[in-house]
Structures are given as structure tokens and as C-alpha cells.
């Protein structure tokens, strides 16, 4: 890592003893590592820069870090820290509420028993729920100027849980994309398979082999996420930096003949490749193949004068293609936009650790100000996942409306969760509640509360949603 030229190093050696300076100088990679782990300690860098008395890259005299304005800069950094802490608490609250709601709906509707996709959604909600539980620790750390008050054991636990659930969340998103492609492609492959696991390889029986395969895949995903988080579990520790205790990942000075910089670069390379590049590539590939497959089936059905998807008109195929395209846009863009800034800055740090590019003032300022914002954006994906993968689906919106109405009006107990004109998606057909038995003749419109219509015969329906599709 190139932090100063030869003249700067000579000046520093005159100002301080070599051993003491070398010790302080060696802490810079640790602070950069902490910044690249979860946004921790990134704002401690100006203090260390000032403590070392480094000459600035632009030749300015030492005494203030790059871009620093003295007390004004300190106030700005304090405001940034407080803002980040508030964002962490907001993300934590929204993530807990959203993922708990998804878990409740899945359990009450037994959705995970009906579909491998829903099994992945349940595990994704559990993963994001565990992930947001770590945010209060990072929020407190930010508010305390990145001091770690929880001890060494909690440093290891929180770091490992954060890393493991980050990997697990990305892996489950990838598994859902692959499963969605397989399900839709299998349903459209031949009309002879109609009625035998259409769009849902699990069918309705827990004994089906595909359902067991989905469960086995979930176990493998959790195991792989735990394996990927082992470096955080092993090397996370508390380190004294200028009299303050910080929680960071610190590799030994020499490990298997390699220095600390090499292992830090390898650690972050794993994060970028295994936690972003490969999953994103698989997600994009699956959705591109899915869109192309549906388009080819539509073209073949139109050319042959036959229906697409086992007797369906080409108009239905066009609507399916439109929904898939919309799903592609939402899923890929949300994942890409939330994680790209964080992973781009991490990639920059990898190049510096491998001495491919020099340490610069621009990188320093990005680590101080931009990296914490990118971490917040990446963490917000845990709030978006419940919305993107559950609540935008029609049957879950209906179930949520039913739940809210039952809470608001407990006296109405015979309300149906779905309207007579709305069919649940094929993978959850078994979730529709049976209609209540026919009752005595009643007026056509007995009662009309907001959102509910009571028809003759004792049938209670929710009003159809204008946003349903």
C-alpha cells in the first residue's frame, strides 16, 4: 500500500521513533479492514492520519486529514455517525416488522409446505431477520465514535452472524431465481404435464422428491454460508487503537508465509466474488433464459396455431411474459442497486491491498464518507426482500388484508381470504380457504363495511384490489 512518498516517510521517521511509528502505521490496514467489513471504524481514519502526522497526497502540511476542516470537519463526521446510527435503527425496525410478518403469513398459510419457492422465501425471511438483529450493535458502535463496548466474545459473535446471514441472504436469492426458472420452464415445456406439478415441483405432498431436494438445498446453503463466514468467526477480535477498543477482523502478521495485506485482499475478494459477482451472474442468467424460453414458446405457439402452455391462448403467454419481465426488473435492479456501491468500494480496497493501485486521498475520503452510506444501502436490502418476494404477490396481499381486517373487526369471523373472482397463483392453489356453507336467504346487501361486502347467503368477500394482476 502506497500512503506516502519517500520524502514523507523520511519526515515521519524524524518526527517519531521508527518502532512506534511502524506500530501506528501498521494499524491503517486494520482500520481499512474494519471499514470494509461492515462500515465500522471508517471515520476513525482521520484521527489516525492526524496522529501519524502524515503529509497529505496533495502536499499540504500535516495536522489535518485530507479534506478536513478542523472542528467543522469533526462536527460533520459526528453528524454522519449519528445519521448512520439512526438509519441502522430504522432499517432494524422495518426489517424486524417486515420479516416477522412474512414468517407469520408463511406459518399461518403453511405456504412453505406447498412450494419450494415459498420454502426459500421462509428461509430468506429468517436470514434477513437474523441479519437485522445485528444492526443495533453496529448502530451503538457508530454512535460511540466506533468504540466497541460489548467485549471480545460479542465482537466475534456479531461479526460472524452478520457475515453468515449476508452470504445466506444472497444464496437464497440465487436459489429462488434458479427455482423460478425451473418451475416456469417445466410448466411451459409440454401441455402433457398440465396438472402434475405445474409451476411447483413440490406439488402438495411433503413426500415428493423435489420438496426434499429443496429442503436439502436449504441445509447446504446454510452450511455454505457458515463456511464462508469462518474467517470472520476466527479472526474477528477487539484491538486497541490509540487507546480505544475497536471490533475488527485482524489477520496475523505472517500466515502461511503471506503477510496480512494478502489475506485481507483475499478475504474481501471472497466477499465480492462469492457474495456478489457469482450470485448476480446466476440471477441475470436465469431470468434471461426464462424470458427467452417464454418468448420462444409464444412464437412456436403462434406459428403452429396451437396454444401456448398446454392450451392457453397466446394472449395469456404475453401476459405471463410481461409479468416475468417486470419481476426481472424488480429483482435484479433491487439486488444490483443495493449492493453495487458497497461492492465497488470493496473492490477498490482489494486493488490497494494487492498493490495494484496506490492509496490516494480520493480512496481515503470515500472510505470516510461514502463507504458508511453504501453499507446502509446494502443493509436496506433486508427490508426490501419481504416486500419484493412476498407482499407484492397477490395471494399474500389478500392474506394480509384478511389479517388486518380480522384484527380491526374481530366480530366478523366468516370472512374469506380470497374473492370469488381472484385465483391464487398456481404454486399456492392449496392455500385457498373453502367457501362457507350456504345459509338462509338474506337481503342482497346486508352489510357493507369498508373493504368488505356481505352478500346474500352469508358469504363475506373482500373488495377486489385495483392493484391485483
Curated annotation (Swiss-Prot):
Pfam families: 7tm_1. Residues 103-119, 178-215, 292-329, 378-469 are cytoplasmic. One of its GO terms (cellular component) is plasma membrane. GO terms for molecular function: G protein-coupled peptide receptor activity; G protein-coupled receptor activity. The keyword Lyase does not apply. The chain crosses the membrane at residues 82-102, 120-140, 157-177, 216-236, 271-291, 330-350, 357-377. Gene3D superfamilies: Rhodopsin 7-helix transmembrane proteins. It is a multi-pass membrane protein. Keywords: Cell membrane, Disulfide bond, G-protein coupled receptor, Glycoprotein, Membrane, Receptor, Transducer, Transmembrane, Transmembrane helix. GO terms for biological process: G protein-coupled receptor signaling pathway; neuropeptide signaling pathway; positive regulation of cytokinesis. CDD domains: 7tmA_RNL3R1. Residues 1-81, 141-156, 237-270, 351-356 are extracellular. It is found in: Cell membrane. Expressed predominantly in brain regions. Highest expression in substantia nigra and pituitary, followed by hippocampus, spinal cord, amygdala, caudate nucleus and corpus callosum, quite low level in cerebellum. In peripheral tissues, relatively high levels in adrenal glands, low levels in pancreas, salivary gland, placenta, mammary gland and testis. Glycans are attached at residues 36, 40. Disulfide bonds join 155-247. Receptor for RNL3/relaxin-3. Binding of the ligand inhibit cAMP accumulation. Belongs to the G-protein coupled receptor 1 family. This is Relaxin-3 receptor 1. It comes from Homo sapiens. The lineage of its organism: Eukaryota, Metazoa, Chordata, Craniata, Vertebrata.
